[in-house]
UniProtKB/Swiss-Prot annotation:
GO terms assigned for molecular function: 5'-3' DNA helicase activity; ATP binding; ATP hydrolysis activity; DNA binding; magnesium ion binding
Subcellular location: Nucleus
Binding-site residues, ATP: 255-262
Alphabetized CDD domains for the sequence: DEXSc_Pif1_like, SF1_C_RecD
Protein's UniProt name: ATP-dependent DNA helicase PIF6
Summary of subunit composition and partner proteins: Monomer.
């Protein structure tokens, strides 16, 4: 078993420390994995940063006498930035920790109060402090050199990679991606893990089992956006997924809404994988990236909006040394919400990784890739501009619809095939665990099946009138943004209180021309009145139990000694608790974590109505849905209906069964690769109900298979995929699927795609390290290299 490396200095803060110069250059040798305060002889008070390459008396000494600014807004979340000069350069020292948050807050308080600098301990960097690994494992009470004791120093709790020799143990298996069993990806190693029935979730804490102070085999994650109630028991699927990651395998994690994918990923990032530049956490949306503490995949890859074709994009990426350095240091790449990434973008990122890392024959240049998402939820959305830029005149018909052969999903690409992913599906529903019949109903809807169970439950919801709770009305989920905006404006005018409060945001952008509307979810202008129904867009420092997606009603406004009055909101999710909502700041980070923009604003938004794209990932207390043809794309009905915990919280004001449909190729992918998720055909509740005026394909066929004979008069040859047993069972289940595109994906190309052959990437790029934002007009890439469009476009 590998034991975690102890602190070099007992009073230090362990974490990820990055140093960035004023011109944006990252100074790697000045960063490290732990820092502390010390009054050094001849230098005065200093912030000392160390890494594994330093000896006990060495480090980078930032003299505090010239400190310019201490940004401690997110100190409670383990983040602190200190702006201080060093060697004639103005530097930003960014400190991030999950293990020593309390110590970081104490450090922030000391840095902000110069009167306390005289109390900083002297010459800490010169003191000899010997702690053996045996001491770390066997005791939590360690005697220091002054004869006193330091208690509750559990150095096993978190692993921070500080050098090439850092690694963590999970069930006795190395969790260093490059040291893992790469050769087992397609062999008996992965197969044996998939067939095992493990009993505990491996972690870096104790080589296979969570420590008792974290709940043993259970986890109580107080996470922003958490969908799981109370304490969470890890399932066999989640344990298998963790073990696969720790063997170095490429893994795809999927599952229905509310099956704990986010909670599992947060545990993986915080407690299992190395926490340094070797592990990169990304997501396709800004909201998901912010929740995970990472950046968007477009920001990390450096592709921006991807305009101009591969050659131009690749040349821009090569011109950014921080992006090239990040690609070459990366050993494990996590991409959340993979279903929202277009296949063109996915292939382009793969080709960039191969080229920058000098490994053209290895997928993603040899990086371990961990993908999460659900292809049966919202599909990728390409803007018209991106679609026109990609097409050459042969990819669209006269109605601007994609031709049948056009790829739609990442799993249809040659890149997906080359990764040889181990597939794991999470099956246990935490969100609807108290209403299992409703969970089965949602699973039918997810696959586009209008069954007797779906008909019965949705008919109940269509006749139900839900009363408000703590003043909260059911949130109307719509498909288009303009519909939500219009509805919210009408409801705001209907309030009796004529007095309103307007809040304008305070914006900062390091890059001229940056449009923050596309980067953060905070609104530039917010108008509130007493009685307004709102949704929280960010966690609050004084109310950590509240998180993004919590709803409430504005009940009053509290006057402040400085600045405008702040809204007081009664939140339904906290039992009617009234909370003062202050201004918060959202930061936009570049590929290496450097802050390039901020917006400070009240983190609220009117929520009588929200779009289905905004609702994705949320758990809402009450929901109202007009289930009709306004839901125009596959997966939209499923996402809207699955936001609640039980059928009692759902009300349908319109009900058209034809709005329930799934993408044929996505359904075929899941039926082929996850046959265990099929329901028993003997269950009468699974019988399909005919829909008047709607044609369902019992055997979803591609466009080329619609005719029974070909031009030569011969019957079309059956595709090999249809001979699979799992797919045969899918025929029997039937499904209401969208057959506008071929069911069977194109076979992967054997030849690796050349740079000249790779098509242009779509402009469906994402805001980085922010909450999901609305989409607006695109700025020039030359003006703003980090600005991206939002992939999840929810307007016409």
């Amino acid at each position: 078993m590998v034991v975690l490396r102890p602190k070099i200095t007992l009073t230090s803060v362990r974490g990820r420390i990055q140093v960035t110069a004023e011109d944006g250059e990252r100074v790697g040798p000045w960063g490290g994995t732990e820092c502390f305060l010390s009054r050094q002889t001849g230098q005065g008070p200093c912030l000392v940063v160390r890494s594994s390459r330093h000896k006990r008396h060495q480090g980078t000494f930032f003299r505090l006498e010239g400190v310019r600014q201490v940004l401690s807004l997110y100190a409670m979340e383990g983040k602190l930035t200190v702006v201080v000069p060093h060697q004639k350069r103005l530097c930003s020292v960014f400190i991030e920790t999950f293990a020593d948050v309390d110590a970081l807050q104490m450090m922030a308080a000391t840095l902000q109060d110069r009167s306390r600098w005289k109390d900083i301990e002297k010459n800490v960097a010169c003191r000899v402090q010997r702690i053996t690994r045996t001491n770390v494992v066997d005791t939590k009470r360690i005697t220091n050199m002054d004869g006193g004791t330091d208690t509750h120093l559990d150095y096993k709790q978190f692993e921070w990679g500080g050098g090439e020799d850092d690694s963590c143990a999970v069930g006795g298996v190395s969790c260093n991606p490059l040291e893992g069993a790469r050769g087992e990806r397609n062999g008996d190693g992965v197969e044996s893990i998939l067939q095992e029935r493990p009993t505990g979730l491996p972690s870096a804490h104790s080589g296979g089992k969570l420590p008792k102070h974290m709940g043993g085999d259970e986890l109580n994650p107080q996470l922003e956006g958490s969908t799981t109630p109370g304490r969470m028991q890890w399932t066999t699927d989640q344990i298998v997924a963790t073990r696969l990651v720790c063997t170095g395998s490429n893994v795809f994690i999927t599952g229905s809404a509310g099956t704990g994918k986010t909670e599992w990923l947060l545990h993986l990032v915080r407690n299992v994988l190395p926490r340094d530049d070797r592990t990169v956490v990304t997501a396709s949306t800004g909201m998901s990236a912010r929740l995970l503490g990472g950046c968007t995949i477009h920001s990390f890859a450096g592709i921006g909006r991807g305009e101009g074709g591969f050659n131009r994009v690749y040349n821009r990426v090569k011109s950014k040394p921080e992006v090239v350095r990040a690609w070459r240091q990366c050993q494990t790449l996590i991409i959340d919400e993979i279903g929202n990434i277009s296949p063109d973008t996915f292939s382009m990122i793969d080709e960039i990784a191969r080229s920058l890392r000098g490994a053209p024959e290895k997928p993603f240049g040899g990086i371990q890739v961990i993908l999460l998402g659900d292809f049966l939820q919202l599909p990728p959305v390409d803007s018209p501009k991106a679609r026109n830029e990609w097409t050459n005149g042969n990819d669209t018909d006269t109605d601007s619809n994609p031709i049948p052969g056009k790829l739609k999903w990442c799993f249809e690409t040659a890149t997906w095939e080359s990764l040889k992913l181990a597939l794991v599906g999470f099956r246990k529903s935490y969100r609807q665990m108290n209403d299992p019949d409703f969970a089965l109903c949602l699973e039918d809807i997810r696959f586009g099946r209008y069954t007797r169970r779906v008909e019965r439950i949705l008919n109940e919801c269509s006749t139900r009138q839900i009363k408000e709770r703590h003043g909260i009305e059911p949130t109307l989920i719509v498909a288009r943004r303009d519909e939500a905006t219009e509805y919210n404006a009408e409801r705001l005018k209907m309030l009796e209180d004529v007095h309103f409060h307007r809040y304008e945001s305070e914006d900062y952008a390091a890059i001229p021309g940056m449009n923050l509307e596309k980067e953060v979810s905070l609104q530039q202008l917010l108008e509130l009145r007493i009685g307004a129904q709102v949704v929280l867009l960010a966690s609050l420092p004084d109310a950590p139990h509240l998180s993004n997606g919590d709803q409430g009603v504005v009940v009053s406004f509290a006057e402040q000694t400085r600045g405008p009055a702040l809204p007081v909101v009664c939140f339904a999710t906290s039992g009617g608790e009234e909370v003062l909502v202050p201004r918060v700041s959202m930061e936009v980070l570049g590929p290496e974590g450097r802050v390039i923009a901020t917006r400070t604003q009240i983190p609220l938004q009117l929520s009588w109505a929200i779009t289905v794209h905004r609702a994705q990932g949320m758990t809402l207390p009450l929901v109202s849905v007009r289930l009709n043809k306004c839901f125009f794309d596959c997966g939209q009905a499923y996402v809207a209906l699955s936001r609640v915990r039980s059928r009692e919280d759902l009300m349908l004001t319109a009900f058209d069964p034809s709005a329930i449909f799934a993408d044929a190729r996505a359904v075929a992918f899941y039926e082929k690769n996850f046959p265990a998720q099929r329901q028993s055909v003997e269950d009468t509740e699974c019988e399909l109900v005919p829909i008047k005026g709607k044609t369902r394909a019992k055997h979803p066929r591609s466009q080329g298979e619609k005719n029974s004979v070909d031009e030569g008069g011969n019957a079309p040859e059956e595709h090999p995929l249809r001979t699979d047993a799992a797919f045969t069972a899918y025929h029997d289940l039937d499904s209401q699927v969208s057959t506008d595109m071929p069911l069977v994906p194109q076979p992967p190309r054997k030849k690796r795609m050349l740079v000249e052959e790779l098509p242009q990437v779509t402009s469906s790029a994402i805001p980085n390290f922010t909450q999901e934002s609305n989409n607006g007009d695109a700025n020039s890439q030359l003006q703003h290299p980090f600005s991206q469009n939002n992939l999840m476009v929810d307007d016409d």
